[in-house]
Design a protein with these regions (language model features):
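An N-terminal structural lobe/cap that precedes and organizes the functional/catalytic core
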Residues: 1-62
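Short, structured coil/loop segments at alpha-helix boundaries
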Residues: 8, 12, 55, 87, ...
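General N-terminal targeting signals
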Residues: 18-20, 25, 79-80, 111, ...
């Protein structure tokens, strides 16, 4: 096994440019769905959070070639807040990268929150989110340059015509100005879309040739909890997914 950085090291150089890191030190809190503290550390240390749950061959092989390297020219401009147009291939790469990070994040909990074996196998073979997963992107223009939350077994109420209750792997990533929401339900369900003025679906692909980021509306500090809790019911206890 090797050390896999939850937030890849190439991101740190970009985040160092963010002026929101200047001034008084901030503490990054990584929490689960019940608000239980997973990790607490300054942004300068966030990049060093690692898990030893990834094999060396995967970490230095397909994860690097198929996800990390292709994702850098896609996500890098978004972290900086620059306009970015994503074609379908880029949408799929970014969605796959986000799903990979969500799965890795589950293992930094104490105790670790195991990810379903079939999801891990799917990522290995396809480097894309599992078929029943959803990934959305947004733009965050708050005071905090980084925010991460992760939970395996979150209770979700999904608008699929009638509301459908499921349990899911869930994660939120705020990296600079880029915001990503990942939701992996345990059962196949078609989720009706939230308003596209602030949130854009990456996965499953919408069929649009290109999508433009950022969307018309930004997420600020006041709206961030709404994005974090999108479709989730924090009042319900989680349950193991594996």
């Amino acid at each position: 096994m090797s050390e896999e950085h939850v937030i890849p090291r190439w991101v740190s150089k970009i985040l160092a440019e963010d002026r929101r890191h200047s001034g008084r030190p901030q503490v990054q809190r990584m929490v689960d769905r019940q608000g239980h503290l997973v990790r607490e550390l300054p942004p300068s240390k966030l990049i060093n959070v690692v898990t030893r749950r990834v094999c060396k061959v995967c970490n230095e092989g397909w994860m690097e070639r198929k996800l990390e390297r292709p994702c850098q020219p896609i996500l890098g401009p978004m972290i900086r807040g620059w306009d970015k147009t994503l074609d379908q291939s880029e949408q799929a790469v970014l969605a796959g990268w986000a799903a990979k990070v969500a799965m890795v994040m589950a293992y930094i909990h104490a105790p670790p929150q195991p990810v379903k074996r079939e999801w891990l196998d799917w990522m290995y073979w396809h480097q894309r989110p599992p078929a029943n997963w959803y990934v959305w992107m947004a733009s965050c223009n708050g005071q905090r340059p980084t925010y991460f939350s992760s939970d395996a077994g979150a209770h979700a109420s999904l608008p699929s015509g009638p509301m459908v209750d499921v349990y899911a792997q869930a994660a939120t990533l705020i990296i600079g100005y880029a915001a990503l929401k990942i939701l992996g339900p345990t059962s196949v369900v078609r989720v009706e879309e939230p308003g596209r003025d602030a949130v854009i679906r990456l996965w499953p692909l919408t069929g649009e040739t290109t999508v433009r980021w950022p969307p018309p509306r930004h997420i600020d500090d006041r709206r961030l909890p709404l994005f974090v809790d999108m479709f989730l019911d924090p009042g319900q206890p989680p349950r193991p997914l594996s």
